[in-house]
Amino acid sequence: MTVENAIAATGITLPEPPSAGGNYISAKTVGNLVYLSGVISRDEHGVITGTAGLDRTIEEGYAAARACALTLLAVLRRHLGTLDAIHEIVSVNGYVNAVAGFSDPPKIINGASDLLVEIFGDKGRHVRAAIGVSALPRNALVELQMVVAIA
Amino acid sequence: MTVENAIAATGITLPEPPSAGGNYISAKTVGNLVYLSGVISRDEHGVITGTAGLDRTIEEGYAAARACALTLLAVLRRHLGTLDAIHEIVSVNGYVNAVAGFSDPPKIINGASDLLVEIFGDKGRHVRAAIGVSALPRNALVELQMVVAIA
Amino acid sequence: MTVENAIAATGITLPEPPSAGGNYISAKTVGNLVYLSGVISRDEHGVITGTAGLDRTIEEGYAAARACALTLLAVLRRHLGTLDAIHEIVSVNGYVNAVAGFSDPPKIINGASDLLVEIFGDKGRHVRAAIGVSALPRNALVELQMVVAIA
């Protein structure tokens, strides 16, 4: 089954991919790697804001990380034409807007990792880092950066 | 027009490239990519210090990010001999020393992105992430990391 | 002398490599690069926790960064079979759990850089970034991410 078919089968709908808000671009192919700009957590209501350990729970963070991954897939579909062009997910860097001492960034970034494996299977397994930071664009709860390999 | 000519035409002068302060190096070529160490914001008076949202404005941050990009170009010129060896800018990671909840890291990192496009044109467009962090070396206002592709 | 022999000669023992705690993997080879997941600081007693500038000194941070580098080498040995397969260390990103305004992340990440050069010599010299962040997994003092090139 192709990835596009897998997405259709799950009923997952990708969001509209965002435009870059400055002199940068959303995706760049170099050789067989596609580098992606960091995207912030959004849903149909707008930016998912807040701070883990302050006014946001781990569950809300998990949903925000999943939303970031969906946005990155939307960016990739626009960039590549189809997600079936992706050979594998290489790396994910997840940044969580968090209070000092918040010890669960991984439980939040799991929202992205789980989605990628749900859609891509073993090829969706990636290396990653999960970091808590003091400030993200538009006060987003999560920012996610990714590199993927194409065939 | 070559990039070196473009820089000369704008009157931009690159700073002296910094030396690595430990057991690491400023730049490393692997295949057709050049990976660069993070550099902190400096001008002719020394390190540009401070914290966005506390004692530094967005405009000061923008200038600090631009200064980082100039420093990275100086590192690249030393590493490659000439900036004309650069095929394109691939990625920029910008870290802003920021108070918790500062929502404008992108407006600061634009200082780097705008400079890269000013000098390299479309080949200067890159993917990027803009993150606010609690602490940077020597209390710098901005740290910038970059990857470029060579011909 | 091979790297494995060099390690044996120094008496350094690598720790047990950690398992990935979710839908991600510890290492992934793409072309001649091996990307590694971020690892947190641990020793034989468990996670090395704490915050630089609050309850941890630079010396404790240096030891924690060195411990992260040892863990990453253990991951690489498991992934590649032998550390002799490594051609060179490419990049290191070091994140330090730090109070706002802590100005010495590089002195802490030197613990990793020094170890890599101790073991790999000139091939261990890498590009790097050292960043202070507000929160790391399990309240770890240091998290380290690395990319290496293989022959």
Task: Specify the residue positions occupied by each region the protein language model found.
Chain A
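Short, polar/acidic, helix-capping and beta-turn segments at strand->helix junctions
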Residues: 1-151
